[in-house]
């Protein structure tokens, strides 16, 4: 059956165009109920159960299916995802609305509908002859959709009666819209709100905890005092932004001070503009990563960024007044040049809430169902939730979602989503850090795995087409110990003309991952492999990462080779790119390769090749540094794990050898050579990587720190910075240069991927290279897969596809890759922090030498070289008299009593695991030397109480 709609439209040129829209209706679309004679099994994919075995409902005791409306799907997805909820009919009308309004919820509901155990059925009501409805005159789209949902619910109930005479199956309409529910009941459709239905499931009381509050401003505490100003409506915000009264930007909460945040202003003209917000009322219920509108305050009210470290440890709603006192303390007198543009949040343009991991802070009021949830991420405020499972959830990691933040509530309201497990357990904590950093880590789906090669796999004649056979070359790989995903291998040999041939051979991942299929889409979504301390979250399935793509020794492997002819001064004479087949002769660790190079007794082909590579690498590095490339430092640590328990038994800084530098130099050279080639061929569509030069203000901390040691650091160019760092030596303080390089690293901007057609600045500041990309790690970086495809097309080894030459799609890919790369780095740091806690838990209290990296108003941040560990020593503690602290930002320095601390001063600290806060167990550092009465702790700390003061009773608004 065909429905058509015809109308006339005026064109830009002033003409008239006739538009005909056709809508096809069918009568062979199945209802999804197995055994339905009327449909004859017409449905496809996951179906409903013939006799639903769902939990007993007190409002609907007979077997039933659920049919939710759009808002239930949007706001109660956590309830629908629960294993107790099965046999749900998802209408096409509802699915389309959800897709338009929330991409994350749409993805979640698609995942649920694809789970056969859940028995969710998607019914295409918009194309079914009996359930399609046309929009009536005067009816808006929302009312039409509500009517379409009711028509489908009514049709289902009538249709199911035809299955058999004694059939009692019903379809229950779930809606939170009071008017829609009333209309449904008038039309004879069984209808309930989500809350009514969930509360009727007496066998599953825990489901009530997962119910979301229904409005942003809803559930206000009765008789609560108004704390925050009202958010302006979106229409007023848009007018204000257009007129320049308000500014739009991303709200970024501080990790160190819960009363402070910054807003990064959007827009080309104000790209780097940053506005400071201080105080609860100025933060005005914004949450980290929200898009907000801010009003700039008069200059007389501008403030300087606070140097105070402040964490929210309030226990009740009445702490607001105390916080106002704390806010006043933040506003200390500073010089005018230290003041920054300051503002206040006037409205929320877009909420970017997500499910948060953390712990329940159980109320001490026995009968209370209201409790505070403390997120693991210190940038997120505490969340008030209602739960009947408090005793069960205490001491466990849970997930909570925010529902709204009323004006009269100190904290937002939310609901319980999921229990992750006991706090402190490795599996639980790993799950938390992966979820908190949005690292996709679910097992690869069957759809993805279906695109893997069938085993046993071998190289065929077809694979050899357009490939060079390099299996005769003495190629080897050099990697960290235990590496199974070997991306790269190298060779060096002397040619007959006396020149050298050097090859970098990279795993040909793009041969196995073809554009657009499920494997490619999942790899693009993950973006990068994430390396945690004891596990790896692969970007591609293990069959590829550790087997077919890994350039293991003594097996034939497909590769993409970059081969140079060089003279003995490492000058490139010719460059060739080719798809190849290689057979690595050795898989070496950095230490093994170094032993070969240094050994006087080894002169085999592999060792000769390594020595040639090492000699050239030294020349290449020297030349890079002369051009202004930076050699920075960061304290990286390596754990030695117990082979049985996998607990860390030793912690030490990573040792770098010449071979580390050797491999790095040739990877850099290959990346630069490939960048030039793909940009020559695809000037508008090359995927490149740039490193922006930091603004001068970034270097202030480095320059001041060096000046305190009578050293001058020049920062006008990368070359002058590199040279002044090289000259910043102290014969009496050899570690000073390393500390300066660590500080310089903190001043740097983040390197990012970008599309060449969308940016004019290609320069890589840190490498002092005019152009750069990533080509050498396609097993663990999706950027490299795209670069391989571009290079393959450039040399005629593969064909192109539309998305590869679409700069807007490439820009979107780059945006995701930059986000995934950043999150992977954060997840890795969190993993190191957790394993450091495990190490010191077993090690007990230790005393070590440390150097001051930063000076704060009430603390010093120190680095312990032995462990590569950074921590904060606080000088103000609860329940203790505060010492007299004098902070000087210009030097910078901190005076405590008669002792003055400067950056890079040597101190001695005690390191211990502080378990007083289960939610945020942390490495606690206390000053041992220099001795300051009332501040420094004695060397003997065997009687120290690390569990902190006893808990006070919590009060929560009822």
UniProtKB/Swiss-Prot annotation:
A GO cellular component entry from the record: exosome (RNase complex)
Keywords assigned: Acetylation, Cytoplasm, Endonuclease, Exonuclease, Exosome, Hydrolase, Magnesium, Manganese, Nuclease, Nucleus, Phosphoprotein, RNA-binding, rRNA processing
InterPro entries membership: Dis3_CSD2, NA-bd_OB-fold, PIN-like_dom_sf, PIN_dom, RNase_II/R, RNase_II/R_CS, RNR_Ribonuclease, Rrp44_CSD1
Enzyme class at the top of the EC tree: hydrolase
Physiological role: Putative catalytic component of the RNA exosome complex which has 3'->5' exoribonuclease activity and participates in a multitude of cellular RNA processing and degradation events. In the nucleus, the RNA exosome complex is involved in proper maturation of stable RNA species such as rRNA, snRNA and snoRNA, in the elimination of RNA processing by-products and non-coding 'pervasive' transcripts, such as antisense RNA species and promoter-upstream transcripts (PROMPTs), and of mRNAs with processing defects, thereby limiting or excluding their export to the cytoplasm.
Subunit text: Component of the RNA exosome complex; within the complex interacts with EXOSC4, EXOSC7 and EXOSC9 of the exosome core complex (Exo-9). The catalytically inactive RNA exosome core complex (Exo-9) associates with the catalytic subunit EXOSC10/RRP6. Exo-9 may associate with DIS3 to form the nucleolar exosome complex, or DIS3L to form the cytoplasmic exosome complex. Exo-9 is formed by a hexameric base ring consisting of the heterodimers EXOSC4-EXOSC9, EXOSC5-EXOSC8 and EXOSC6-EXOSC7, and a cap ring consisting of EXOSC1, EXOSC2 and EXOSC3; DIS3 associates with the base ring of Exo-9.
Protein name: Exosome complex exonuclease RRP44
Organism in which the protein naturally occurs: Homo sapiens
């Amino acid at each position: 059956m065909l429905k058509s709609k015809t109308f006339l439209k005026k064109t830009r040129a002033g003409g008239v165009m006739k538009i005909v829209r056709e809508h096809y209706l069918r009568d062979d679309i199945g209802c999804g109920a197995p055994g339905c004679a009327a449909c004859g099994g017409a449905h496809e994919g996951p179906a409903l159960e013939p006799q639903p075995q769902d939990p007993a409902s007190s409002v609907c005791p007979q077997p039933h299916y659920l049919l939710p409306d759009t808002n239930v799907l949007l706001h109660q997805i956590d309830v629908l995802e629960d294993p107790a909820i099965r046999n749900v009919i998802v209408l096409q009308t509802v699915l389309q609305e959800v897709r338009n309004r929330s991409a994350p919820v749409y993805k979640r509901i698609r995942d649920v509908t694809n789970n056969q155990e859940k028995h969710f059925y998607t019914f295409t009501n918009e194309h079914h002859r009996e359930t399609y409805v046309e929009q009536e005159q005067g009816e808006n789209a929302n009312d039409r959709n509500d009517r379409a949902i009711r028509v489908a619910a009514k049709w289902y109930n009538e249709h199911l009666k035809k299955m058999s005479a004694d059939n009692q199956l019903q379809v229950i309409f779930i809606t939170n819209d009071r008017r829609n529910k009333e209309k449904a009941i008038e039309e004879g459709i069984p209808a309930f709100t989500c809350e009514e239905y969930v509360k009727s499931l007496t066998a599953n009381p825990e489901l009530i905890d997962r119910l979301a509050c229904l409005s942003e401003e809803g559930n206000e505490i009765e008789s609560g005092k108004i704390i925050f100003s009202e958010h302006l409506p979106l229409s007023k915000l848009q007018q204000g932004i257009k007129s320049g009264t308000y500014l739009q930007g991303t709200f970024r909460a501080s990790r160190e001070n819960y009363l402070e945040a910054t807003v990064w202003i959007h827009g080309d003209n104000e790209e780097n503009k940053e506005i400071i917000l201080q105080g609860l009322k100025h933060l005005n219920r914004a949450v980290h990563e929200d898009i907000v509108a801010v009003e700039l305050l008069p200059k007389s009210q501008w403030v300087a960024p606070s140097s105070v470290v402040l964490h929210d440890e309030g226990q009740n709603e009445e702490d607001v007044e105390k916080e106002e006192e704390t806010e006043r303390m933040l506003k200390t007198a500073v010089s005018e040049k230290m003041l920054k543009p300051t503002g206040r949040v006037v409205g929320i343009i877009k909420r970017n809430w997500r499910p948060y991991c953390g712990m329940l802070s159980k109320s001490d009021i026995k009968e209370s169902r209201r409790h505070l949830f403390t997120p693991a991420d210190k940038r997120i405020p505490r969340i008030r939730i209602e739960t009947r499972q408090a005793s069960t959830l205490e001491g466990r990691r849970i997930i909570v979602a925010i529902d709204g933040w009323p004006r009269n509530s100190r904290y937002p309201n939310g609901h319980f989503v999921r229990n992750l497990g006991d706090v402190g357990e490795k599996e639980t904590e790993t799950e938390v850090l992966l979820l908190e950093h949005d690292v996709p880590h679910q097992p690869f789906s069957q759809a993805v795995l279906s695109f893997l090669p069938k085993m046993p796999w071998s190289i065929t004649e077809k694979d050899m087409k357009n490939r060079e056979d390099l299996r005769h070359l003495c190629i080897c790989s050099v990697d960290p110990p235990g590496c199974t995903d070997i991306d790269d291998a190298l060779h060096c040999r002397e040619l007959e003309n006396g020149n050298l041939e050097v090859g970098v051979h990279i795993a040909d991942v793009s041969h196995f991952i073809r554009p657009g299929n499920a494997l490619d889409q999942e790899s693009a979504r993950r973006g990068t492999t994430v390396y945690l301390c004891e596990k790896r979250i692969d970007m591609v399935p293990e069959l590829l990462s550790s087997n077919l793509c890994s350039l293991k020794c003594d097996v034939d492997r497909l590769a993409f080779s970059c081969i140079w002819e060089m003279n003995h001064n490492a000058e490139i004479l010719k460059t060739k790119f080719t798809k190849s087949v290689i057979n690595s002769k050795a898989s070496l660790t950095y230490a093994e390769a170094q032993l070969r190079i240094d050994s006087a007794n080894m002169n085999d082909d592999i060792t000769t090749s390594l020595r040639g590579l090492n000699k050239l690498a030294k020349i290449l590095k020297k030349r890079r540094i002369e051009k202004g490339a930076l050699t920075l430092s960061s304290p990286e640590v390596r754990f030695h794990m117990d082979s049985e328990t996998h607990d860390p038994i030793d912690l030490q800084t990573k040792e770098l050898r010449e071979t580390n530098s050797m491999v790095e130099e040739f990877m850099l050279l290959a990346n630069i050579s490939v960048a030039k080639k793909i940009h020559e061929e695809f000037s508008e569509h090359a995927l490149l990587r740039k490193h922006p030069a930091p603004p001068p203000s970034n270097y202030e901390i480095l320059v001041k720190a060096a000046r305190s040691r009578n050293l001058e650091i020049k920062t006008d160019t990368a070359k002058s910075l590199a040279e002044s760092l090289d000259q910043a030596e102290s014969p009496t303080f050899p570690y000073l240069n390393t500390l300066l390089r660590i500080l310089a690293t903190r001043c740097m901007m983040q390197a990012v991927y970008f599309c060449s057609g969308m940016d004019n600045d290609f320069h890589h500041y840190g490498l002092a290279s005019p152009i750069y990309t990533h080509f050498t790690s396609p097993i663990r970086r999706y950027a490299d897969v795209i670069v391989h495809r571009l290079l393959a097309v450039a040399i005629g080894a593969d064909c192109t596809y539309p998305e590869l030459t679409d700069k807007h799609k490439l820009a979107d890919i780059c945006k995701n890759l930059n986000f995934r790369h950043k999150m992977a780095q954060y997840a890795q740091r969190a993993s190191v922090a957790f394993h450091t806690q495990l190490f010191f838990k077993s090690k007990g209290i230790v005393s070590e030498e440390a150097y001051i990296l930063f000076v704060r108003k009430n603390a010093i941040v120190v680095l312990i070289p032995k462990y590569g560990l950074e921590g904060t020593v606080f000088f103000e503690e609860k329940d203790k008299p505060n010492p007299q602290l004098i902070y000087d930002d210009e030097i910078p320095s901190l005076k405590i009593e008669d002792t003055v601390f400067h950056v890079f001063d040597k101190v001695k600290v005690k390191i211990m695991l502080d378990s007083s806060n289960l939610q945020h167990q942390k490495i606690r550092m206390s000053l041992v030397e220099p001795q300051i009465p009332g501040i420094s702790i004695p060397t003997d700390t065997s009687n120290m109480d690390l569990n902190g003061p006893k808990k006070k009773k919590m009060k929560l608004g009822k």
